[in-house]
């Protein structure tokens, strides 16, 4: 179950040790497809020189077809992270570890160019993790007033937003509290209904 855990709890400390995570880091959770905007997120992170932890099965896929246009973002990500020891790729992780990860992350960064729903935002908010995202697709509606919004098409805007939240403890607490409230609006039943409503709107 996604929830906020006390930072002293074993689960939280254990996930840090298990994956050798830094004390503070930005977190990305998800796939590597055109709409996720991951190459631009990495460029933004490299501008401000802070650690980025990325969780998602596709991130560790070494056997993808590099000539397939759908995989171009994976090709770009491979090149961008090659010599960057501040970027940690975890690949697929269990739900238990993911919950602990949201709890220890300083900020979730999800600068998508489009989302049908944006589940990681709600998962992060439920765990009290501050969120930086965009107003693209359904994200503005899902995030409400509980996120720091950036421009999906501008790496400088993404960098500034992440840095602002990353370095501002007061803002982190404010976004965390607002996020916990916002997430309560989306019980799983509501989430399914809302997802269906949003999908019907785009069909």
Residue ranges with predicted function:
Residues 1-203:
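Carbohydrate transferase catalytic cores enriched for Leloir-type hexosyltransferases
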